[in-house]
Amino acid sequence: MSDNVIDKLYSIILDRMKTMKEGSYTVELIKRGKHYVAQKVGEESTEAIIASLVESQQRFVEEVSDLIYHLLVLMALENVTPQDVYKELERRMKK
């Protein structure tokens, strides 16, 4: 695992999935299931768009952070790693 924050956060999410730590927001999302998490990704995406259009840059950063977090939870539920995404992005950059 690398030292970047995305990989670290993904590792924490996987740990929460494994331990089902009581009181964890990640665990609450996991318990609600993939459909709920996917809905949260949609909500956070909309909030990020709105923030980019009418709110401060800081608010936009906060909403993008929420979006990335929820995407990582959904990725974990789908058994997709950040490395899978990195590889796909690298493949696309070569085009």
UniProtKB/Swiss-Prot annotation:
This is Phosphoribosyl-ATP pyrophosphatase. HAMAP family: HisE (MF_01020). Keywords: Amino-acid biosynthesis, ATP-binding, Cytoplasm, Histidine biosynthesis, Hydrolase, Nucleotide-binding. Disulfide bonds: none annotated. The gene is hisE. It comes from Sulfolobus acidocaldarius (strain ATCC 33909 / DSM 639 / JCM 8929 / NBRC 15157 / NCIMB 11770). One of its GO terms (biological process) is L-histidine biosynthetic process. Its main location: cytoplasm. SUPFAM superfamilies: all-alpha NTP pyrophosphatases. It comes from the Archaea. Pfam families: PRA-PH. CDD domains: NTP-PPase_HisIE_like. It catalyses: 1-(5-phospho-beta-D-ribosyl)-ATP + H2O = 1-(5-phospho-beta-D-ribosyl)-5'-AMP + diphosphate + H(+). Its EC number is 3.6.1.31. GO terms for molecular function: ATP binding; phosphoribosyl-ATP diphosphatase activity. The keyword Amino-acid biosynthesis applies. It is found in: Cytoplasm. InterPro entries: HisE, PRib-ATP_PPHydrolase-like. GO terms for cellular component: cytoplasm. Belongs to the PRA-PH family. It is an enzyme of class 3 (hydrolase). Pathway: Amino-acid biosynthesis; L-histidine biosynthesis; L-histidine from 5-phospho-alpha-D-ribose 1-diphosphate: step 2/9.
